[in-house]
Amino acid sequence: MSSAIPTSSVNPVKGMRKNGKNWHDSKKPFRPTSGLTSYEKRLEARKRQEAVKEHERELREEKEAERKAQIQKIKDRRAAKEEKERYEKMAEKMHRKRVERLKRREKRNKLLHS
């Protein structure tokens, strides 16, 4: 007796729909949490996002530092030009040696107070 029961891969009949519209697909229950990612995937995505933000922060800080260095360079250049003009004005009124002496004294005082 080697007879097997024939099995077919036919979908079982669901029965008639209540409203009679059997040509429509039957609706499935709405489960919004079923498509969510696993905890490990969320952690990995969060780590990637934090790494990107950290990199962006570093780039912003680097750009800001360059900008401040440029501003400081301009300020130093202006101060040096101003000081040079001031000494030239003093040289018009006074002797050259006295101007040089005042220059040295101001430089000493600047170093002491800085």
Curated annotation (Swiss-Prot):
One of its GO terms (biological process) is rRNA processing. Keywords: Coiled coil, Nucleus, Ribosome biogenesis, rRNA processing. Residues 94-114 have a biased composition (Basic residues). Residues 1-114 are annotated as: Disordered. Residues 40-101 form a coiled coil. The keyword Coiled coil applies. InterPro entries: Cgr1-like. It comes from the Eukaryota. Its main location: nucleus. The keyword Nucleus applies. Residues 39-93 have a biased composition (Basic and acidic residues). It is found in: Nucleus, Nucleolus. It holds the Pfam family Cgr1. GO terms for cellular component: nucleolus. Belongs to the CGR1 family. Involved in nucleolar integrity and required for processing of the pre-rRNA for the 60S ribosome subunit. This is rRNA-processing protein cgrA. It comes from Aspergillus fumigatus (strain ATCC MYA-4609 / CBS 101355 / FGSC A1100 / Af293).
